[in-house]
Amino acid sequence: MVVKMDEYKNEIDSMLEYTYQWLPENYSDPTEPILKITKSSLGTFDWCPKKYDFSYQQRLPQDQTEAMRKGTIMHNAREDFFNDFDIKKAETMSEEEILDYCSSLFPIDDYCEDYQTIAVFESQRFIDALAENKTHEYLPVCNEGLFDCEITIPMGPYKGGAWNNNEEFSLSRDYVVHLQGIIDRVFQEGNGYIPMEFKTGAWKDYKATGMRKEMAFYKILIDNASDLVLRNAGLEPNIPVSHWSWYYPISNHIHCETSKKRNETSVMNNIARLIHSYEQKLFETKFYYKTCAHCSYFGICDAAQEDTWV
């Protein structure tokens, strides 16, 4: 079903305004914006509430690192790969030609070696799809799709964590918040969707917990998006998210697993924690010298400066 752009625009415009510079004390005023939450903003808060405050509330600039530059360029290249891949053309090729074809769809730049790793992976995936007569599932049904939705976060109570001495907390009321995100890819296998996240850094086993939170955020986003938003991104409302996946080509690591409700619960709890920080107007630091030393806000963070001089 093709969505008319004016219908999609009207759907988005009908949602409440949203912002990171949110004031919970004004929530009852219908003219005031609600809280905007993305996978990145929630991940930053989980990593360090103070960094979230610097980046999203105060909107202080960050230095662009080589990792950021690489991520942007390689994400664009992978998006273009799927836009340009011709199933009918590839079906007539030999295995060697399929690899050459996949390689040819990537640009020539500083990351050619990384692209070749991806080309090998994608060529083998297509060869396997050919053998199983599943080339119709090779391309993603959604390639860099934008999703928006509104969800209600109950007042609680919520279990606390190490961040607040494991004390339970409650919000002052239920809140509607706006979730937004761009999902790299969504594939369909059988009767289920599989969101897949593309990462350009190196895989470490400790990252699995964070990846599950990221993918659970996307599942919540898809599950709560309207039919128009889903169809605009290429998805059908009656097909559920059955699995999620992530791909780290630099480490030749790919993982796919059944989606887990407990990870969604963890994300919802983190959103409640974020709202609680806004209510308390308190965004505490999580100082750890090995990671904080690379933070763009190291020079203005009181916790970092105090620890440095100890």
Where are these regions (language model features)?
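Short, compositionally biased low-complexity segments
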Residues: 43-53, 75, 85-105, 236-250
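Mg2+/Mn2+-dependent nuclease catalytic core
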Residues: 148-273
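Accessory/regulatory regions of helicases
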Residues: 1-23, 292-293, 297-300, 306-308
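Polybasic (Lys/Arg-rich)
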Residues: 262-299, 303, 309
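N-terminal structured helix/loop subdomain that forms the ligand-binding/catalytic interface
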Residues: 6-35, 45, 49-60
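Short amphipathic alpha-helical segments and their helix-coil junctions
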Residues: 31-33, 49-62, 100-105, 192-201, ...
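A non-catalytic, helix-rich entry segment at domain boundaries
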Residues: 73-167
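Nuclease catalytic cores
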Residues: 35, 39-87, 115-124, 144-145, ...
